[in-house]
UniProtKB/Swiss-Prot annotation:
Keywords: Acetylation. This is CDKN2AIP N-terminal-like protein. The modification N-acetylmethionine is found at M1. Interacts with XRN2; the interaction is direct. Residues 24-116 form the XRN2-binding (XTBD) domain. Belongs to the CARF family. InterPro entries: XTBD. It comes from the Eukaryota. PROSITE patterns: XTBD. It comes from Mus musculus (Mouse). It holds the Pfam family XTBD.
Amino acid sequence: MVGGEASAAVEKLVSGVRQAADFAEQFRSYSESEKQWKARMEFILRHLPDYRDPPDGGGRLDQLLSLSMVWANHLFLGCSYNKDLLDKVMEMADGIEVEDLPQFTTRSELMRKHQS
């Protein structure tokens, strides 16, 4: 019977992961590539328990979605933001593996090369 209990526990876990992924899917942007979405969905799902909206509202989920966009925009599009905000989202994303990220050159780097 122990095997049956373990199997039921695994099925419950898989079902929960599926439900969470289905829930997150509604927040995918039309313009996001599969790679961008997978990374951002991992960011969202990782922090979803801490950002669930309280019964009286409060916008915690909106805050999480905004933070996920800041992180994705910085990573994939090279957008820059306030240092404190970037520090926060980079800390939140610690451990999320993203391969083949684009490389960006800042204006300052271009100016230094031009002056050399």
